[in-house]
Amino acid sequence: MKANIACVQMAPKVCDVKHNLQKMSSYVHEVMESNPSTNLILFPELITSGYECGNTFTQIAEIAGEGPSFKTMSNLAAKYHVNIIYGFPEKEEKQSNIIYNSCIYITENGNLGGVYRKVHLFDTERKHFKKGSDFPIFETSFGKLGVMICWDTAFPEVARIHALNGADLLVVATNWENPYSDDWDLVTKARAFENCIPLVAANRVGTDEKLSFFGHSKIIGPTGKVIKALDEEKEGVISYTVDLDDAKPLRKNYYTFFEDRMPDLYKRLLSP
């Protein structure tokens, strides 16, 4: 199965949801008007809010499937018949004081397809967000998606769990900051290679209060080779048609990671 993927590299305005949604909408229009056959549009982590919102996160967080960002993006998804994934601060439905750093998946029909809550929180995120507790697979018309958010990508266990659960594509939404671009380039290629699964990653650009972000959004093949990337620290979009079936013969010839695994010897990995 082939999937035409668009990866948006954008600079959000910190704590300004209305502005960011207008900008996101413009990118959706741009992508779909230039390539109506696009299957998936991916935005970065916390793209509706920006990264350094501090206590304001509690004011602008949304319940998944409700709120301004979902209404705006679901209408666009249905209009263009395209799947959309983006990062946002999520408010737990019954506990308004509990906030997650989440990615929402909206189906090509404009429905809520699922939510992933970031498990590996980084640095100051722990002051504002509660960590997630599972790694769901999102079912689409073109294949299964395993989503990671930023620091999750530094942990090989996450991508491996997605692979074992049948993911056809690894999807990463991030706010990876300067000066750690080399680390970002390394871990994204490694996660694709060690699981022999293509990976698409959207990082933001611009500056919030203190941090600046370098972009380097990319699409990586199942052997870890970068197929297409935005290397400059500026806004833009990359699009590419990924053949999700390419990995299958590779896993039988040389990239035999799953055939050669020895889970019985890995019990130490489950210990603290």
Curated annotation (Swiss-Prot):
Disulfide bonds: none annotated. It is found in: Cytoplasm; Nucleus. It comes from Schizosaccharomyces pombe (strain 972 / ATCC 24843) (Fission yeast). GO terms for biological process: cellular detoxification; oxaloacetate metabolic process. InterPro entries: Aliph_Amidase/BUP, C-N_Hydrolase, C-N_Hydrolase_sf. One of its GO terms (molecular function) is hydrolase activity, acting on carbon-nitrogen (but not peptide) bonds, in linear amides. It comes from the Eukaryota. This is Probable nitrilase C965.09. The keyword Acyltransferase does not apply. It is an enzyme of class 3 (hydrolase). The active site is at E45 (proton acceptor), K118 (proton donor), C150 (nucleophile). The lineage of its organism: Eukaryota, Fungi, Dikarya, Ascomycota, Taphrinomycotina. Its main location: cytoplasm. Residues 3-244 form the CN hydrolase domain. One of its GO terms (cellular component) is cytosol. Belongs to the carbon-nitrogen hydrolase superfamily. Keywords: Cytoplasm, Hydrolase, Nucleus. Its EC number is 3.5.-.-.
